[in-house]
Amino acid sequence: VPTLRRIVVLTAVGVLATGVAAAAAPASAPAGGAGPRPPATSPPPPGTAGGEAWAWTQLTAAGTRIRYVSTDTSQTCPAVRYSLGTTRNPYPMTRVSTPMGSQFPTTVCELAVPLAASNAVLEQSSVQAAVVHPANRQLPLPDWTSATRPRKVAVIGDTGCEVPVAGPVQNCADHQTGWPFPRIAANAAAVTRPDLVVHVGDYLYREDPARENDKAANPGCTTTAERAGWDCVVADFFRPAEPLLATAPVALTRGNHEDCNAAQQGGAGGAWFRYLADVLRSDGRCITYSPTASIRAGTLNLVSVDSSFADPGDTGSTAQAGVFTRRFDAVNQAAQQHPANDYFVFTHKPVWMVKAAGTLPQNVEWATHVLDAAVDATGLHRLADNVRLVLSGHIHLYQMLDFNTGRPPQLTVGSSGGPLDNGPDDAKVVGKEIGTPPQAVHQSITQEQAPGGRGVFGYAVLADGGGTWNLTFHDASGAVRGQTCALSTTAASKSFVCH
């Protein structure tokens, strides 16, 4: 694995305002890092012709993509020059979509980048936006090869600030204890410095921006009519996530908050498919069930299963199990093609997660029954041997649950920004039988302020341990909280050994 992260450098045009122009020259990256932290910038006023652009690197089933979204009026895409072996050539980004009404006043572009690419530069003359994020215009590329894997994977989930139409509103302006996602993203980038960031879904929570208390920071996302528009996508995800997007590529799966509206057009689901989905759409349409996406990060394979519409009411229903059985069959087929590689399933709703447990054996509440039933109905009646882990969110807690059987452990990371839930008493979870067929929980570690109490804000890290994965939970400051757990390497008894 190279010791220097490969960097994409975004070089802005010379017509920038003075403060932006001062930052136009790309800063040099220190060894092992992704460059200095970009300075804070303010977005241009709404309607500015020069507009504002956001760029990031995303892993997809079709490979690594550089994505670029701009509100400038040119409707053009920049070109990227990068090195590949001994050659260095420019490559134009492909325009995916043009502005579409008030919800999507953006031009969206993307470019496929080979795994071995390095030193990519956005051509100076091709950038039309007045402001580009990250402000230092540097974007990370994968620092693994086809024969290696990421050394450090950060897992986040349920990150948006909850502003519902009715009911309690999260304190979006308080980034310490109210809505700490901006702090979590900054500290994960600075302290953990991951090689890859996995987001397990739920990005867009501002259902009624008129009720939020951080309107001044988010022009264009302040009224009910503006919900799920581009400026709200920036407010809930791109602006707070900027330090992470400047540090590592991302792999994304969809959450239930990115659902379709009744018209299957626009809304949060339309925003997901326009900007963040594995395959982008230009028509504003929303699809209820996305295809499974198998994403390669060297010898680590991440398979995204869209569970955003699995049991919408969280009632324990198994309706539509067949839809998900087909997707888990696809997971198994992909895993069996590369039996020597590790596979992680990442899906928003957990397959096996305990929300509450009492003293009696039958007193246990777990999620998500329809996904569990779907796994049992696959051709294997289980997940493949080399599916080592399931990564999920949805429940606003951190929990590691294992069974010490062929069933992979369930890691739930729904604690990265949204209002926290109460968790179970882990002592009462151990030994409870859940799933199909019923299997006893071998180990349950839930990060809580007290047993059975409120969860703790933070994120998870999976570090390559030389043939295994070492799991840690990090609080909002980036500090490790609790034990370090090493994932076993045997297919018959998948579990964590914690110390």
Task: Give the predicted meaning of each segment.
Residues 147-253, 258-259:
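Conserved, compact domain cores that house catalytic/ligand-binding motifs in diverse enzymes
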Residues 68, 158, 197, 202, ...:
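Divalent metal-coordination and catalytic microenvironments
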Residues 159-163, 203-207, 256-260, 307-311, ...:
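Solvent-exposed loop/turn segments at secondary-structure junctions
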Residues 8-13, 17-174, 182, 186-194, ...:
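Acidic, histidine-bearing metal-coordination/catalytic regions of metal-dependent phosphoesterases
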